[in-house]
Amino acid sequence: RCRSKKIICNYHGRRFDDEGKFEFMPEFKETINFPRKSDNLHDFPLFVWHNLIFVGLNPSFSIEKVFEKINERISFLPLQNLKLDKKLSKDYSIDANWALYCDNYLEGFHVPFVHKDLNEVLDYNNYDTEIDEYFNLQIGYAKNKDECFQIPKDHKDFGKNIAAYYYWLFPNLMLN
């Protein structure tokens, strides 16, 4: 739902109500057959998960159902408190096909050679992959208990030394 009473296009001056219904455009008062229903803003499915907003232009599956399953696994994490820390953030600009990037994210054979810090934490010989209809989950286990999540007793992963959950949602969203 829009928080403003009006939506105004700064480029054309078109004005819409808070539901996206066309109201006005400068210099078009006398135009025949204007406005039409097609001049209203389109309605797109919107889903908010913590501080992330997802819009489906033509969704073929329910993102809400996908995140319900993800929440079953990681709801114990205080995701609502996450804030960007620029000191811990790294940006990489790469010239690669998106599918190749996804493939790189999903295969872990390169970790010992490319991600030295991560390789010190993860037990390379202990790794699980779970496949769902629209996402997969890779679970990285820690070499020692100091590097793992504090998992609640009633959780399916309680007692496991899990250092990372790597989610890949079809076609190109990665969460870890």
Spans of features found by a protein language model:
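Rieske [2Fe-2S] iron-sulfur-binding domain
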Residues: R1-N58
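C-terminal catalytic domain of Rieske-type non-heme iron oxygenases
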Residues: P45-V48, L52-N176
